[in-house]
Amino acid sequence: MNNVLVLKSSISGNNSQTNQLADYVIEKLQGNHIVVRDLAQQPLPYFDTVAAIAVRGEPKTTEEKQLLALSDELIEELKNAQTLIIGAPMYNLNIPTQLKSYFDFIARPRVTFQYTAKGPEGLLKGKKAIVLCAFGGLYDEENLVTQYMKSILGFIGITDVQFVYAQGIGLGAEAIEKAQSSAKNKINELITSL
């Protein structure tokens, strides 16, 4: 049995193409231990000065201690997962702020990465990630969502990353159907190796 962490980040709820793809993955992975965290339905606090102090220093106030406990909880979920499924739609050329806040809370020095003489080294090695991306238009792999997700996951040590794209969903119903079908075929290929 595989431990799977599914991160949803779309603000579109059930109408979201990435949420629909994430639900498809969940359905296909029944029998595994699956934890779902919907970052849009249950958003994390905005990562501000108080949060930065909490996760990078010695928390002193009650609020700082609560934010550190939240960071610890998120990191523990991630550490327990062998496979990470991330719904990462494109909003204004980038990932949703809800997903960015998640990475701000889990990217912690000496916990999920460390600095070395050769540069940063991720500490969450040996995990697989599948990133589900829905784009209104048609983009190549140099788009900001793909580049950011590769970078942040690699930064924390997750380098076995596969992408599933549902592109052109802003082009109408026929394009959505085609994008979903193509994405589901790719998902079917990828989950056989989990």
UniProtKB/Swiss-Prot annotation:
SUPFAM superfamilies: Flavoproteins. It catalyses: 2 a quinone + NADH + H(+) = 2 a 1,4-benzosemiquinone + NAD(+); N,N-dimethyl-1,4-phenylenediamine + anthranilate + 2 NAD(+) = 2-(4-dimethylaminophenyl)diazenylbenzoate + 2 NADH + 2 H(+). It comes from the Bacteria. GO terms for molecular function: electron transfer activity; FMN binding; oxidoreductase activity, acting on NAD(P)H as acceptor; oxidoreductase activity, acting on NAD(P)H, quinone or similar compound as acceptor. Binds 1 FMN per subunit. Gene3D superfamilies: 3.40.50.360. The keyword DNA-binding does not apply. Coiled coil: none annotated. InterPro entries: Flavodoxin_fold, Flavoprotein-like_sf, FMN-dep_NADH:Q_OxRdtase_AzoR1, NADH:quinone_OxRdtase_FMN_depd. It holds the Pfam family Flavodoxin_2. Its EC number is 1.6.5.-, 1.7.1.17. FMN binds at residues 10, 90-93. Quinone reductase that provides resistance to thiol-specific stress caused by electrophilic quinones. Also exhibits azoreductase activity. Catalyzes the reductive cleavage of the azo bond in aromatic azo compounds to the corresponding amines. Belongs to the azoreductase type 1 family. This is FMN-dependent NADH:quinone oxidoreductase. It comes from Haemophilus influenzae (strain PittEE).
